């Protein structure tokens, strides 16, 4: 969620005609392609927010 919020806005601005479902699909592909090291800060932030 933490990663996708910022990415969703960026993708929507870059592709104004893209449907929300298409954006979600694209975000899923992008997330899966990230290395674990690149995902780690977002996963840690999500965990921190979950505790609050």
Swiss-Prot record:
SUPFAM superfamilies: HMG-box. One of its GO terms (biological process) is cell differentiation. Residues 1-52 bind DNA. InterPro entries: HMG_box_dom, HMG_box_dom_sf, SRY-related_HMG-box_TF-like. Coiled coil: none annotated. GO terms for cellular component: cytoplasm; nuclear speck; nucleus. Keywords: Activator, Calmodulin-binding, Cytoplasm, Differentiation, DNA-binding, Nucleus, Repressor, Sexual differentiation, Transcription, Transcription regulation. It comes from the Eukaryota. GO terms for molecular function: calmodulin binding; DNA-binding transcription activator activity, RNA polymerase II-specific; RNA polymerase II cis-regulatory region sequence-specific DNA binding. It is found in: Nucleus speckle; Cytoplasm; Nucleus. The keyword Repressor applies. Interacts with CALM, EP300, HDAC3, KPNB1, ZNF208 isoform KRAB-O, PARP1, SLC9A3R2 and WT1. The interaction with EP300 modulates its DNA-binding activity. The interaction with KPNB1 is sensitive to dissociation by Ran in the GTP-bound form. Interaction with PARP1 impaired its DNA-binding activity. Belongs to the SRY family. Transcriptional regulator that controls a genetic switch in male development. It is necessary and sufficient for initiating male sex determination by directing the development of supporting cell precursors (pre-Sertoli cells) as Sertoli rather than granulosa cells. Involved in different aspects of gene regulation including promoter activation or repression. Binds to the DNA consensus sequence 5'-[AT]AACAA[AT]-3'. SRY HMG box recognizes DNA by partial intercalation in the minor groove and promotes DNA bending. Also involved in pre-mRNA splicing. This is Sex-determining region Y protein. It comes from Akodon azarae (Azara's grass mouse). The gene is SRY.
